[in-house]
């Protein structure tokens, strides 16, 4: 019997395109990061469900899809067969959506959010594409 080492404990075995896309989400880590958003909302003096849901969507777009697509673009750690142009689109379009949601949140809420949105957009690209070779 031949066994191959999986790229991650949660990665489904290769064999179909949909598994590549599910693996790309890194579901345990995506849910872990989304839980931080929920925990942050839970310790706030009052919960604004609309803000929580939009923030969850923004983090899912930026981290769950965007960051993981850029990471796969940079070295294929999961070994998916997702075409490079698709990974570029999955990396930048959801990230742009998250930045737009963050900017809209700043307009509706407080402008103090903008530095965090800008830094988040920058660090997702820089870290996942390894722009400083580290």
Where are the language model's segments positioned?
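Aspartate-rich (DDxxD/NDxxD/DxxxD) Mg2+/diphosphate-binding motifs
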Residues: 9-11, 21, 58, 62-97
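Helix-coil boundary and interhelical linker segments in multi-pass alpha-helical membrane proteins
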Residues: 38-57, 99-115
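Membrane-embedded alpha-helical segments that form the functional core of polytopic membrane enzymes
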Residues: 47-69, 113-126
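Intramembrane alpha-helical segments
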Residues: 83-134
